[in-house]
Amino acid sequence: MNIAIAGKMASGKTTLANHLVERGYQKVSLAGKVKEIARDLFQMEEKDRPLLQQIGMKMREIRPSVWIDYIIHLGEQHDNLVIDDVRFVNEARVLQEAGWIVIRLNIEDKLQKERLQNTYDNWEVHWDNRSDSSETEVMQILASDVNLELESGPDAIEEMMAYLDQRSS
């Protein structure tokens, strides 16, 4: 069973994914190649969200499905993969059509801001980028394109695991 987690920045996507990694899943990333390009070609040393967003979007201008095609190919070769960076409607839809379990994690602005402040010294840069399409489009993913919708918070892991246990039995 392959799982894709969608949500805004600081919503807890990586926390959910890491929980699955502890249970034997392998984490892969739609943005992994973007980060690799940013490090190799732009000497990015610490997370530069605007740079990553620009690289990702420019590649999507060349071929809109570039990142999702890469992940679908991995999913055809491996099972028990988890992705924690689904951001776009087409990504969620294509992954679900390919048999992936798609989970959307919602977060309120106040909690999102608190988490960014606690995570990044330059949290304002991240907060100011919340109007980027990679942040806004995730909330346009239709309910029919997700298998499970969760609210960010202490119960999210337990709710996710209960759902996945039910699916696997």
What do the predicted segments below correspond to?
Residues 8:
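P-loop (Walker A) phosphate-binding loop of NTP-binding proteins
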Residues 13:
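Conserved lysine of the Walker
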Residues 16:
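Hydrophobic positions on the alpha1 helix immediately C-terminal to the Walker A/P-loop
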Residues 19:
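Active-site signature of alpha/beta-hydrolase-fold catalytic machinery across serine-
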Residues 26, 72-119:
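ATP-dependent NMP and nucleoside kinases share a basic, alpha-helical "lid"
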Residues 26-80, 87-90:
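ATP-dependent small-molecule kinase phosphotransfer cores
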Residues 66, 105-169:
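Small-molecule kinase domains that catalyze NTP-dependent phosphoryl transfer to phosphate-bearing small molecules
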